[in-house]
């Protein structure tokens, strides 16, 4: 049952609800019998009440109506201790989670329950996690750039406002720091907020992210209301039902900020592959015939129902950045292939750039965006981006020759290309606000116009006489001159 938004939703009293009992338990799947005429709807939340006050209630979601007044439901938490005959209550609505400003700075599970030991969430506003995508008339179809203040992203692989971005990065290449910087920048530039959905991620990674966000100020421990992000986690150790629905919980919280607060929202999903994987587990448990490579036959439908809700409306936007795991590096695998159909841009983090100390380690040649078209970004932006890519591509082609024969064996034109490419490579690095406490360098937010101006000047040869180190970890091109002069003064005084 898909509901339209109702943010004044109230839970009816227990006495008025339909009651049934468990007739079968197979792992995280329960079969529940109800009286004739009292059957719950698909996606309704069922609650199995613990026998003692010490035992937690188990919430399940109706997935199938089996006939003979029975339903099949998937549990959102462990089913240890449950037994046949236990009473089950139909809540009458889908799983509903808290929404609004009180969710900022907090960590939630799939049911919207806080798990950070900071007490209950002070809000009466609840919203069901199953909702329809915004109607056509409410959509904002304009193609507009979502400026992030990160030079390499805005210039070479710009994000679309209300679009979806695939973030490809292994361990230790700066994925977490890039995520935190995007959260910080959207809060400052747009007055927006972010929601992070940890879908099937490691508990340690989720804890590390929370601690780093507190250290960098993205989460304000003293004044939680001033935090810029809400966190929703469904870890690897949780049942497949929780991992399958935690993405919808995060999205529901993001939709409130878009529809009611009229804000630009950044939604992170890590990892979208685990959303598909959990759906595959649930599908097998429900007895559905598997499709290609063992995935669920409803893969495209499940992915579409999530992705179509991530969009721009006339009130605000949800821009989504999704980490994508590619099984065995096979891009034709149904899980990543289905995801790619929804992506507007890809941001690829490079281990070789990270090894050089160039952060953010975004690969300028592998990262792509459908927004990088002259009719969308303008002629100047498009031509500058293409010239930058051509210069970096030529440098990449020459690297083998340089490694074998050295720079001296190159032609004058190629040597000039290499020098400018190395300067551009370093200019596309920049200090981050969230890394200030580690690096000691103040963070920089660089506008797109300044990035284009800087790259144009480097390519035109205006800075051929400056050392390439002057371009490393600066903001605008004006800082390059200042840094070069400072280095010159230091060398002179020595």
Swiss-Prot record:
Membrane topology: Peripheral membrane protein
Compartments where located: Plastid membrane
Superkingdom of the organism of origin: Eukaryota
Record InterPro entries: AAA+_ATPase (IPR003593), ATP-synt_VA_C (IPR055190), ATP_synth_F1_bsu (IPR005722), ATPase_a/bsu_AS (IPR020003), ATPase_alpha/beta_chains (IPR050053), ATPase_F1/V1/A1_a/bsu_N (IPR004100), ATPase_F1/V1/A1_a/bsu_N_sf (IPR036121), ATPase_F1/V1/A1_a/bsu_nucl-bd (IPR000194)
Keyword Nucleotide-binding recorded: yes
GO CC terms: chloroplast thylakoid membrane; mitochondrion; proton-transporting ATP synthase complex
EC number(s) per entry: 7.1.2.2
Primary site of residence: plastid
Catalytic activity: ATP + H2O + 4 H(+)(in) = ADP + phosphate + 5 H(+)(out)
Gene Ontology MF terms: ATP binding; ATP hydrolysis activity; proton-transporting ATP synthase activity, rotational mechanism
Keyword Translocase: yes
Pfam families assigned to the protein according to its UniProt record, in alphabetical order: ATP-synt_ab (PF00006), ATP-synt_ab_N (PF02874), ATP-synt_VA_C (PF22919)
Annotated binding of ATP, by residue: 169-176
GO biological process: proton motive force-driven mitochondrial ATP synthesis
Disulphide bridges: none
Keywords noted in UniProt: ATP synthesis, ATP-binding, CF(1), Hydrogen ion transport, Ion transport, Membrane, Nucleotide-binding, Plastid, Translocase, Transport
Family listed: Belongs to the ATPase alpha/beta chains family.
Subunit-structure text: F-type ATPases have 2 components, CF(1) - the catalytic core - and CF(0) - the membrane proton channel. CF(1) has five subunits: alpha(3), beta(3), gamma(1), delta(1), epsilon(1). CF(0) has four main subunits: a(1), b(1), b'(1) and c(9-12).
Function: Produces ATP from ADP in the presence of a proton gradient across the membrane. The catalytic sites are hosted primarily by the beta subunits.
Protein name stated in the entry: ATP synthase subunit beta, plastid
Source organism per UniProt: Cuscuta obtusiflora
């Amino acid at each position: 049952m898909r509901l339209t938004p109702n943010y004044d939703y109230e839970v009816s009293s227990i006495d008025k609800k339909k009651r049934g009992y468990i007739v079968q338990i197979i792992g995280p799947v329960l079969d529940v019998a109800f009286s004739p005429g009292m059957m719950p709807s698909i996606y309704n939340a069922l609650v199995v009440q613990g026998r003692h006050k010490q035992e937690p209630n188990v919430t399940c979601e109706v997935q199938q109506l089996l006939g003979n007044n029975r339903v099949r439901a998937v549990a959102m938490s462990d089913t240890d201790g449950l037994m046949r005959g236990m009473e089950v209550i139909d809540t009458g609505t889908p799983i509903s989670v808290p929404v609004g400003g009180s969710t900022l700075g907090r960590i939630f599970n799939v049911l919207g329950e806080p798990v950070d030991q900071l007490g209950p969430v002070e809000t009466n506003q609840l919203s069901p996690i199953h909702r329809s995508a915004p109607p056509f008339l409410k959509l904002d179809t304009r193609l507009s750039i979502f400026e992030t203040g990160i030079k390499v992203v805005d210039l070479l692989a710009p994000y679309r406002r209300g679009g979806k971005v695939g973030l490809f990065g292994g361990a230790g290449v700066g994925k977490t720091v890039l995520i935190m910087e995007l959260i910080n920048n959207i809060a400052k530039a747009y007055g927006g907020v972010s929601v992070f959905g940890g879908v099937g991620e490691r508990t340690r990674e989720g804890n590390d992210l929370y601690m780093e966000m507190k250290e960098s100020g993205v989460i304000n421990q003293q004044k939680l209301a001033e935090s810029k992000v809400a966190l929703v986690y469904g870890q690897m150790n949780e049942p497949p039902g929780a991992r399958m629905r935690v993405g919808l919980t995060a999205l529901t919280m993001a939709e409130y900020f878009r529809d009611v607060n009229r804000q630009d929202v950044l939604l992170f999903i890590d990892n979208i592959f685990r959303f598909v994987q959990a759906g595959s587990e649930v599908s097998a448990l429900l007895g559905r015939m598997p499709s290609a490579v063992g995935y669920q036959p409803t893969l495209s439908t499940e992915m579409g129902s999530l992705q179509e809700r991530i969009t721009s409306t006339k009130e605000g936007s949800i821009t989504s950045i999704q980490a994508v795991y590619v099984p065995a590096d096979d891009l034709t695998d149904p899980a990543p292939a289905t995801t790619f159909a929804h992506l507007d841009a890809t941001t690829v983090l490079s281990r070789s750039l990270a090894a050089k100390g160039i952060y953010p380690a975004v690969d300028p040649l592998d990262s792509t965006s459908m927004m990088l078209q002259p009719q969308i970004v303008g002629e100047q932006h498009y031509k500058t981006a293409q010239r930058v890519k051509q210069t970096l591509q030529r440098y990449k082609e020459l690297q083998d020759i340089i490694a074998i024969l050295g720079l001296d064996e190159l032609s004058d034109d190629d040597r000039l290309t290499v020098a400018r490419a190395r300067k551009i490579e370093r200019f596309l690095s920049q200090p981050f606000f969230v890394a200030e406490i580690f690096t000691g360098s103040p963070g920089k937010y660089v506008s797109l116009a300044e990035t284009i101006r800087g790259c144009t000047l480097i390519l035109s040869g205006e800075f051929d006489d400056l050392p390439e180190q002057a371009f490393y970890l600066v903001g605008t091109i004006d800082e390059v001159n200042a840094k070069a002069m400072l280095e010159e003064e230091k060398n002179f005084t020595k």
